[in-house]
């Protein structure tokens, strides 16, 4: 299994257990699904709640959301009120990525710059439809992933987008 981590914060962003598609050599599109999970439902062998008082058992909470977000502890951020603030973040973040690429993979710099401009124009055109997520550390200096819902066979499917060059792959 491969885990993809933010190269700036070290936060786990997603794994290869999902359907992953590379777009224009710069964006990973990861297909998620809406899930509901019960938390706090504890089963103990030999424990018979009916033999106790009437108010026994544990409270259970149902957690609902996109599996990628829940499994990798991503946190929704509302840091970008408008397209302009997101564009400012992107310019700063792209500078950080170019510096990292020049250091570790100089052959990728031109590919990144060329293709990222094309991809970001497309993404900025859909800005109002996007949700934004940071890693568990909630550090906006690192990667802010994007999510949108796309209609596939009459069903809304959550698609998360991550910058390929902002991730490091860890094999388990």
Swiss-Prot record:
Its main location: cytoplasm. InterPro entries: Mss4-like_sf, Mss4/transl-control_tumour, TCTP, Translation_control_tumour_CS, Translational_control_tumour_p. Keywords: Calcium, Cytoplasm. Pfam families: TCTP. Residues 1-172 form the TCTP domain. GO terms for cellular component: cytoplasm. It is found in: Cytoplasm. Belongs to the TCTP family. This is Translationally-controlled tumor protein homolog. The lineage of its organism: Eukaryota, Metazoa, Ecdysozoa, Arthropoda, Hexapoda. The gene is Tctp.
